Amino acid sequence: MAAPDSLSHGPSGDSVCLQEEKVSAEMMLVDCLTNYQELVSFDDVIVDFTQEEWTSLNPDQRTLYREVMLENYKNLATVGYQLIKPSVISWLEQEEFSTGQKIVFPEWKIQLETQCSASQQELLRGNISNGMQTQTGSDTGRGLCDGTQYGDFFSELSPLRTVMKTRPAQDNYDSSQCRKDFLMLQRKKCAGEKLSEFNQSEETGAIPGKAYQKMATQEKCFECSDCGKSFMNQSHLQTHQRTHSGDKLYELNECGRSFINSRLAVLIETLNAKKPHRCKECGKGYRYPAYLNIHMRTHTGEKPYECKECGKAFNYSNSFQIHGRTHTGEKPYVCNQCGKAFTQHSGLSIHVRSHNGDKPYACKECGKAFLTSSRLIQHIRTHTGEKPFVCVKCGKAFAISSNLNGHLKMHAEEKTCECKICGKAFGYLSCLNNHMRTHNAKKSYTCKECGKAFNYSTHLKIHMRIHTGEKPYECKQCGKAFSHSTSFQIHERTHTGEKPYECKECGKAFICPSSFRIHEISHTHTEEKPYKCQQCGKAYSHPRSLRRHERIH
């Protein structure tokens, strides 16, 4: 383990090393997410420090470390991964991290005293199945357990440590060369290459850095004829061209998956070797048995964390903690621009995009962009017509799960909210309040152009399109545009031939419901007038006649 005085090469050296490791980790992360999504985890892109290394960093360097780790975690979260927030991230999100009072070892995310009890050692080996517990180091400054004393648990140290070991014990070495050596070692570690050249150079203390000087001066003279991208050597160009041809030359023995890049194949094999504990149900691998035990809850349905307030249970402790904020009202994540607060950091991150105008998830069909991937998935269903959420009681299908949940409540709950004027009942008070506006003579939303009033703001917004001429709904078949979505949907049926409204008496079908209702009256042979004016009581057989009459009031 590197001694504290071995890290005294100045803030700029550590900062650049951290930035270089950030770039390397991000490259590794992108490759993994693109080609082998199920094996990447936060542990694979983490930067770890020993206690001695941490105490040697100044506040600026610790701040940089915080930014690197939070950004790596954000990169995983923003591509749609459902992550259990690591304790190191929760720790870094606290303001007091820079004081150095807490030391977190990211590899295990457990704080240890110098003398570990037998039960604690069993916990590290994964023999205790109820999750990992945390101990706090003593105030007297006792350090972390040494990796040599406790086997291989802390053997995968940062490449920075390996580079430092190869350096002679002197203060006047070239820090820029150290940075180059460190980045080279990190890349070799990611690619699974042997580090023999570094071990051979320990006697002299010399580590080759010519490759980096060549990379800095060499021009990118190999250009892809398909997309114009340039590369510094022909082998990189050949690897890139396989992305256009679809050729995958390197196959993994264990899972049979193929890759275009030998380095990526070696990387995946390395990741597989680092995760020997496999789930028998789905085959997912983990580094430690304790992580596997937590994962098994998804298969067994075990939910050990139960809320005392409402009885809801959770698989993971962090989900339970977030849920507890719904009862306490705690919202620790506050937007600096508008002051809006959130219970989760992910909610704040999504909200910040609304200020920046950043909508990274775009629909390939119509080009509409969204803040989150889940909203994009919901939108795509409007193109495909997919409705995967089906009510088991009545068979009605929905494109969004929340709509199904609201629909199920209508089956489960009695309609206790009854209108005293007309007797109509509703399952929710909010629905009754909306209904009451139809009885109230006062219409709160008035058009400034013509003075027409409406019960709902959405109705006023739709009405304003008459004055502005806005027609946002355009038919792709004939180019005709409409100001109302319902008119657009009815028009589309003229192209598809769909007639969903069929008369049970004669079998005649109609495109729109209004035509169907008028037709139904013709079968009754009575002058039924279901549309009654609430002002004077006069009744009409068609809604258009009622609307025409209401204008005189």
UniProtKB/Swiss-Prot annotation:
Protein role: May be involved in transcriptional regulation.
The KRAB domain, residue ranges: 40-111
Entries under Gene3D superfamilies matching the protein: 6.10.140.140, Classic Zinc Finger (3.30.160.60)
Compartments where found: Nucleus
SMART domains attached to this UniProt entry: KRAB (SM00349), ZnF_C2H2 (SM00355)
Source species: Rattus norvegicus (Rat)
GO biological process, alphabetically ordered: regulation of transcription by RNA polymerase II
GO cellular component terms given for this protein: nucleus
Protein encoded by which gene: Znf426
Upper taxonomic lineage: Eukaryota, Metazoa, Chordata, Craniata, Vertebrata
Zinc finger (C2H2-type): 222-244, 277-299, 305-327, 333-355, 361-383, 389-411, 417-439, 445-467, 473-495, 501-525, 531-553
Keyword annotations of the record: DNA-binding, Metal-binding, Nucleus, Repeat, Transcription, Transcription regulation, Zinc, Zinc-finger
A UniProt-annotated Pfam family: zf-C2H2
GO terms, molecular function: DNA-binding transcription factor activity, RNA polymerase II-specific; RNA polymerase II cis-regulatory region sequence-specific DNA binding; zinc ion binding
Protein name from the UniProt record: Zinc finger protein 426
